[in-house]
Every structure is written in C-alpha cells, then in structure tokens.
C-alpha cells in the first residue's frame, strides 16, 4: 500500500495536505504569527489520537448494542516542564450513565488498541530527504492516488 500526501503552502504560515481527495488545512495561532484560520499541526496530531481512540470506544459500544449517548473522550497532553515536548498524553473516557460496570475495563482495553497511539508506542523511523523541485518521484495525482478535484469542481491548484 502506497500512502502519499501532497503538501502545499497556500500563504502565510498555512500548510495544507492533500490526501485521497481531502484537504487537511493547518495554520499557526495568531500568537505565533499565523492567522488562526485552522488548527495547528500539533492540534491535529492530538485530534488524530482522540478521534482514533474515540472510534475504538464507539465500535466497542456498537458491537454490544450499548447506548452511546453521553459517551465522550478528552485528550490532555502533559508537557515536560524542562522542555516543550509532551511527556504524557491522557485519554479520559466518559462513560454513558447506563454503561454496564462489567464492560468498564474492556472498553479501556479497546481504546488502548487505537492504531495512532500504538504507532507512537512503537515509533517508526523517520527519513527526511531532499529532492529537486523537478520531482524525482511522480506526484500523487500523477500516480492516480488522489483526486485532483472536488464535487464542487474546485481543483487543488485553484485553492493555492
């Protein structure tokens, strides 16, 4: 499976990613020189953990026909006081009022299976390489991996 994201710089401190026909937009907060028009990349990092964990909690309940009204998750990063990096990420699962006690530990084990979280626990190696702008590799669109348009007819180029 080839997973490829195309990254664009639409202006200011905004950085956007095109993935499988979806634009993922980011910006920096105003306090950091951005316009605050979109979440920061770090916000999306935390959101990916929360939404992944949330998916596992939701599916756990759905597979057991449990009421999900009131089910919620929160993600809280705890930073290292000596540095800027996060030392712990706490995922809090708020269970619905009628949630059966016998499933309490099981839903936490399900949330623990979040693939985003698991990738952090067993961190991949990162490889950063430089290439000429003439593209040594074909773009995702050239490889047929992404849609170059949207249902409204807007093309990625018109958004830049």
What are these regions (language model features)?
Residues 1-47, 55-160:
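Extended beta-strand/beta-hairpin segments
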């Amino acid at each position: 499976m080839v997973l490829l994201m195309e990254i664009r710089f639409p202006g200011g401190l905004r950085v956007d990613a095109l993935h499988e026909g979806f634009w993922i937009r980011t910006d920096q907060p105003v306090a950091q020189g951005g316009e605050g028009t979109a979440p920061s990349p770090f916000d999306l990092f935390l959101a990916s953990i929360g939404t992944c964990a949330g998916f596992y909690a939701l599916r756990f309940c759905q597979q057991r026909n449990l009421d999900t009204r009131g089910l919620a998750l929160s993600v809280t990063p705890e930073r290292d006081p000596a540095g800027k990096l996060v030392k712990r990420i706490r995922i809090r699962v708020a269970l619905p009022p009628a949630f059966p006690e016998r499933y309490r530990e099981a839903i936490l084990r399900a949330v623990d299976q979040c693939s985003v979280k698991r990738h952090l626990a067993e961190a991949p190696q990162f490889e950063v390489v430089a290439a000429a702008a003439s593209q040594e590799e074909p773009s995702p669109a050239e490889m047929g991996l992404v849609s170059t348009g949207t249902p409204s007819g807007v093309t990625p180029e018109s958004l830049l």
